Amino acid sequence: MTLISSVEHKKYIKISSGNYRVWAEWILDYEQYKYPEDLDMVSKLIVDNLEMKFCPPRYRDENMGNPLFGHCYHATQALYYFFKDTNLKAFAAPCKIAQQHWWVQDGDNIIDITAGQYEAFGIDPPYDKGKETKWYGWKNRPHRKSQNLMKLVQPSANLYFKQYEEKPKKVY
């Protein structure tokens, strides 16, 4: 049985202090993969579909010679959502080569599809400092980069924009 899921990146407008309304959202409808059977295949597909445009600008120079560098967050988030209904947990830790490093864990089993970036620096990923964490970003919503990467990995997925009202004007 195929499990269809959605990942929504909602756009909010502030109504009043602490009160927000969704005015639009990017939605990705996709098929979840089977864990752990499809883990190696999905990991390879994610790595094979990493593009420079997904890498934050501050990491792009280093990424030129180290193609996994700067991709841990969105690659890990994509992996997490492809296996959304499993027991995977998001982990992060401060690291020497960038601000944070991200991976997922299944119990004590570390699953880090961008760990290879550390080989160029001759150091190990900072798993010893890792803690289970929520995704960063407002309301822990998935990043658009993660949705775009997931669409590349699974071309049959449907990525679309749904607008509920006109784009609100910012009031300062």
State each model region's role.
Residues T2-Y172:
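A structural boundary/capping signal
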